[in-house]
Amino acid sequence: MKARELQELRKSSPQELQSKLNDLKAELFNLRFQLATGQLENPMRIREVKKSIAQIKTILREEEIRAYQQ
């Protein structure tokens, strides 16, 4: 994800982030299935999706911590 996209994600609501996270997890599942069957055209996409999942989880956790501290 680009820095601009990350800033937009930080402005999103937790529900939107959770929805995006679920979509990315489903995409990762499909990519792994394609990899196993030898149909995956772009193996780097797996890495990109994993990184996006980690970034969204980090943003969600930061918001949890921020809410707890207040």
UniProtKB/Swiss-Prot annotation:
GO molecular function annotations of the record: structural constituent of ribosome
Keywords: Ribonucleoprotein, Ribosomal protein
Biological process, per Gene Ontology: translation
Pfam families (UniProt xref): Ribosomal_L29
UniProt cross-references to Gene3D superfamilies, sorted A to Z: 1.10.287.310
Keyword match Cell membrane: no
InterPro entries with a match to the protein in the record: Ribosomal_protein_uL29, Ribosomal_uL29, Ribosomal_uL29_CS, Ribosomal_uL29_sf
Gene Ontology CC entries for this record: cytosolic large ribosomal subunit
Family label: Belongs to the universal ribosomal protein uL29 family.
Protein's name in the database: Large ribosomal subunit protein uL29
Species, as recorded: Clostridium botulinum (strain Hall / ATCC 3502 / NCTC 13319 / Type A)
Gene: rpmC
